[in-house]
């Protein structure tokens, strides 16, 4: 379902899209302006997780960080590979069940996250992180300008050169297909482009 305000089973009010099969989501914002998101980790092998990763952004906006980290450490092997990011107006936190040292604080700055660990230097991540950082710096506090200029960057369907492609075990043709920020395909592709800004006072756009 499209992004909208709804109430989770635990009673948390969130702005999020919704997987109508599992009930989870990939990106969520609560009324306090806290943001959470999950991405899959590309591993080149069938996924074996027993619990849907879509529950994680919702849990990240409900549980305390301490309880969330304990839950993730206890259940890490029950999920297929994932990256979870939780952001508040004060700080951020990142957890991946494929990280050698899962659970780390994120400090103020510009970061990139795709379908591997945080800051993994894939071509599209490097390109987007630089462009997004420049755009944010130039836009200042004008959220409307920022949204309008970030969306075309995220919708770039230009593939990376072959010599820069990572090897994630899916073969050259698939690596090439997956190398653009916005993926266009008949059976697989990017479904949505979302830009969320939260002001220091908690105003969400």
For each predicted feature, which ranges?
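N-terminal nucleophile
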Residues: 1-205
